[in-house]
A protein has these predicted regions:
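A short coil-to-beta-strand element that immediately follows conserved catalytic motifs
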Residues: 16-17, 92-101
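Short functional micro-motifs and their immediate structural scaffolds
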Residues: 14-15, 34
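Conserved N-terminal beta-strand and adjoining loop/helix that marks the start
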Residues: 28-51
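Short cysteine-rich clusters marking metal-coordination/redox-active sites
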Residues: 6-9, 26-29
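Conserved Nudix-box catalytic region and its N-terminal flanking loop in Nudix hydrolases
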Residues: 46-88
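Residues immediately within or flanking Cys/His clusters that coordinate Zn2+
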Residues: 3, 23
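Nudix hydrolase/Nudix homology domain
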Residues: 2, 130-167
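Active-site-adjacent beta-strand/loop module that shapes the phosphate/pyrophosphate-binding cleft
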Residues: 103-127
């Protein structure tokens, strides 16, 4: 979300060329809105060739299938966020094994971009059940994924996971 007014002094921001890009900047003080990405995690768990997805219960993309995950808290390590989000959304305790990759993608129709850190994790406990902002959870074969995947970054992540497991 871009600022209209300076959060330091209240002046209206103006567009200014800074570091080779047009950025909202304050004409009275040193504030520049760099419009940084928001960090998120996604967690892929595979069991017997099937990956766990959640059906979103909130916007954006309510009713679409989603990789379990969410935004990091300001003081949270991404691996800890992965564990927390999996427990909240699926009831499962997981241990992140590796980072599959990173993707930058728009967060629905919002005016910000998200940096999605996608983990592969293994289940270490809990009971699989939909929680917090999930309507339901389901295990899908990696070769028969649903068409209605929520975010643009998720299909390449699922394809990368599928290709890695084939090798």
């Amino acid at each position: 979300m871009a600022y209209t007014f300076c959060p330091k002094c209240g002046s209206r921001l103006e567009s200014r060329a800074i570091d080779g890009r047009e950025r909202p900047a304050c004409p009275r003080c040193d504030f520049v809105d760099y419009e940084n990405v928001k960090p998120c995690v996604g967690v892929l768990v595979v069991d017997e060739g099937k990956v766990l997805l959640v059906e979103r219960g909130i916007e954006p993309f309510k009713g679409y299938w989603d990789i379990p995950g969410g935004f990091l808290e300001s003081d949270e390590h991404p691996a800890d966020a992965a564990k927390r989000e999996m427990l909240e959304e699926t009831g499962l305790l997981v241990e992140p094994v590796e980072v599959l990759d990173f993707w930058v993608d728009a967060y629905g129709d919002e005016e910000f971009m998200a940096l999605n850190i996608c983990y592969v994790a293994r289940v270490v406990g809990g009971e699989a059940k939909a929680g917090s902002d999930a309507i339901r959870i389901e295990w899908f074969p990696l070769d028969a994924l649903p068409q209605d995947i929520a975010f643009n970054w998720e299909r390449p992540a699922l394809e990368k996971l599928r290709d890695r497991l084939r090798d």
